[in-house]
Amino acid sequence: MGIIVKIFFLFLLTLDTEARPISYSGGHTVMHFNDNMKESIYYHYSPSFKYSVGVEKFDDKIFDRSDTNLRFTYLVNRKNTKNSQRNFYFQSAVSTKNKNYIYGVHGDWETRRYFIGFDYKEVKNIIDYKNKHIQLGFAPYLGTYGDLHTWLMLKTKKNSLRKKQITYPVIKFFKGNVLLELGYDKKTDWDIHL
């Protein structure tokens, strides 16, 4: 592995890189996504626990082009209880190269044992389309702080361009501030979130 790649991964590990739409006040997050629609690297800064601003560099696999988006995410509602947490976000992005933009909502509810999440986005592009997914999961064991945590999940995605709904298994690992999510479907290939 080249020295540049090693330095890049070392840089990622030294940041607070837990995959989340908004970090704590003053926090930074770096995420990498790869699926059948796009591959991207995304960085955001959270001046407040209520919102984040960021930049996403991506390769659009459908329209075979690269672009950079400026992103904004706002925490509309959060509810913490003794046993669970619920989040609801507004998300948006605008292209730095053209008039393309994205807006949508993202939400989740989880306990230490169960997880439910959803995402809905409208994409204004060369051809406008909608992305949506639902994710359900459970933790096969309960770890304590600092342990490696594992989630077994099912993800269902539908995209208005492809007009087919696909459902596939996902496994999610996280420890400390690092998260890795892997899913696979033979029709869409790998779905990776780091």
Feature map (PLM): residue ranges:
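N-terminal alpha-helical scaffold/docking segments in eukaryotic complex subunits
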Residues: 20-25, 34-40, 44-46
